Amino acid sequence: MPRSLKKGPFVDDHLLKKVDLQNSKGTKHVIKTWSRRSTVIPDMLGHTIAVHDGRKHVPVFITEGMVGHKLGEFAPTRTFRGHVKEDRRSRRG
């Protein structure tokens, strides 16, 4: 169920402060965050945000198509290594 329009998008305060500070200074340093639940807003365009995936921080460059999505969508938490190919030695019979 989508969030109510009167509430607006959710962005953690500490992340919003860091983005606003860099926008006012005109710098584009990497912002490290654990806030996967924050929504991408237009103020973040052009910034690189390192989103934590549970093990490391994945750098995500924010573009127009990402606005409205959550940061966690761009840093997958699970790595699928593929199914093991059928092993003839393990089958007996």
UniProtKB/Swiss-Prot annotation:
<dbReference type="GO" id="GO:0015935">
    <property type="term" value="C:small ribosomal subunit"/>
</dbReference>
<keyword id="KW-0687">Ribonucleoprotein</keyword>
<comment type="function">
    <text>Protein S19 forms a complex with S13 that binds strongly to the 16S ribosomal RNA.</text>
</comment>
<dbReference type="GO" id="GO:0005737">
    <property type="term" value="C:cytoplasm"/>
</dbReference>
<dbReference type="GO" id="GO:0000028">
    <property type="term" value="P:ribosomal small subunit assembly"/>
</dbReference>
<dbReference type="InterPro" id="IPR005732">
    <property type="entry name" value="Ribosomal_uS19_bac-type"/>
</dbReference>
<dbReference type="GO" id="GO:0003735">
    <property type="term" value="F:structural constituent of ribosome"/>
</dbReference>
<dbReference type="InterPro" id="IPR020934">
    <property type="entry name" value="Ribosomal_uS19_CS"/>
</dbReference>
<keyword id="KW-0694">RNA-binding</keyword>
<comment type="similarity">
    <text>Belongs to the universal ribosomal protein uS19 family.</text>
</comment>
<dbReference type="GO" id="GO:0006412">
    <property type="term" value="P:translation"/>
</dbReference>
<dbReference type="InterPro" id="IPR002222">
    <property type="entry name" value="Ribosomal_uS19"/>
</dbReference>
<dbReference type="GO" id="GO:0019843">
    <property type="term" value="F:rRNA binding"/>
</dbReference>
<keyword id="KW-0699">rRNA-binding</keyword>
<dbReference type="Pfam" id="PF00203">
    <property type="entry name" value="Ribosomal_S19"/>
</dbReference>
<dbReference type="InterPro" id="IPR023575">
    <property type="entry name" value="Ribosomal_uS19_SF"/>
</dbReference>
<protein>
    <recommendedName>
        <fullName>Small ribosomal subunit protein uS19</fullName>
    </recommendedName>
</protein>
<keyword id="KW-0689">Ribosomal protein</keyword>
